[in-house]
Regions:
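Gly/Ser/Thr-rich phosphate-binding loop
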Residues: 79, 101-109, 118-188, 201-202, ...
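Conserved beta-loop-beta connector loops within the AMP-binding
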Residues: 196, 202-225, 261-262
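Conserved AMP-binding A3 loop
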Residues: 18-42
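Conserved S/T- and glycine-rich ATP-binding loop of Class I adenylate-forming
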Residues: 17, 23-26, 59, 65, ...
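Conserved pre-ATP/AMP-binding loop-to-beta segment of ANL
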Residues: 2-22, 29, 52-58
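Active-site glycine-centered loops adjacent to acidic/histidine catalytic or metal-binding residues
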Residues: 138, 161, 194, 255, ...
Length: 298
């Protein structure tokens, strides 16, 4: 229980540090990421807008606290006078039980959690009484997962972010003009990382050599870069890593992507994971997505 005698001290300014999260990315050694109050506030309000989160909602925390502070929702839900139900460990049967018991309307989870939900046995599942809204992030999801989740009564939105940006900085916001597309095309679009998240100053796919945005042709690969108040203060006691990540006034994500003509961003790979064969850049993510659609792959 909390300390009844605790007295909150107002921060001296909004740039004062509020938390320290750790990330390793693909480079191995963990780096401390320093968050400030302003960025945490912007992420919280941005999520409420992007996800159309209502006041007094019941939220299921599935994302671990050590993953970007649970994607920032420990701040978002209190702001909305909501109730947080904490899942201590990934237990699919428990997820369905908690949704029913607490009338859960929203939760977030990585694609692997969604795979576990759609692969659950009949004894583990419970029929949903109403639509449950889900955010997925942490890894590019195979497009087929959206249809599988929809069949169970979930509505999934794909978002993208990093520990260094407090969480989400892109969202695959749905456009009504896509409603008439066939299911495969819809699911393909839902797997995109999307467009700029609310309260994010700017997110672009930029050629790291020229520092110019790539054309919106869905083919030219660049690096996702971010700027604004939702970028960390820096890496804790690591000026060299901070300066490298913030070169030219942008935070360099290390994720390679293209921009489609409609402005929606789609990740192709991590810069360290791209496969080069015969002079061509081959996306390991596209290979994984193709395999996931095969009927022999569960």
């Amino acid at each position: 229980t909390g300390d009844e005698n605790y007295v909150w001290k107002k921060p001296k300014d909004e740039w004062q540090a509020i938390s320290l999260s750790y990330t390793s990315g693909t480079t191995g050694n963990p780096k401390g990421v320093v968050y400030h109050h302003r960025g945490s506030y912007l992420m919280s309000t941005g999520s409420a807008v992007a996800w159309n989160m209502p006041n007094r909602l019941n939220f299921l925390t599935v994302v671990p606290m050590f993953h970007c502070n649970g994607w920032g929702y420990p701040w978002t839900i209190p702001m909305l006078n909501g109730k947080t139900i904490c899942l201590r460990a990934i237990d699919i049967k428990k997820i369905f039980e908690l949704i029913e018991k607490h009338d859960i309307s929203h939760f977030g989870g990585a694609p692997i959690v969604l795979n576990m939900i759609t692969g659950a046995s009949e004894s583990e599942r419970k029929k949903l009484k109403k639509k449950v809204f889900v955010l997925t992030a942490g890894a590019p999801p195979p497009s087929i997962i959206f249809k599988k989740m929809e069949n169970l009564g979930f509505e999934v939105m794909h978002v993208y972010g990093l520990t260094e940006t407090y969480g989400h900085i892109l969202q695959c916001a749905w456009n009504d003009e896509w409603n008439s597309l066939d299911e495969d095309k819809k699911n393909e679009i839902k797997a995109r990382q999307g467009v700029r998240y609310p309260n994010t100053e700017d997110t672009k796919v930029i050629d790291p050599e020229t520092m110019k945005p790539v054309p919106k042709d869905g083919k030219t690969i660049g690096e996702i870069m971010i700027k604004g108040n939702i970028v960390m203060k820096g890496y804790f006691k690591d000026k060299e890593a901070t300066d490298k990540a913030m070169a030219h006034g942008w935070f360099h994500s290390g994720d390679l992507a293209v921009v489609h003509p409609d402005g929606y961003i789609k990740i192709k790979d991590r810069s360290k994971d791209i496969i080069i064969s015969g002079g061509e850049n081959i996306s390991s993510i596209e290979i994984e997505n193709t395999l996931a659609k095969h009927p022999s792959v569960s």
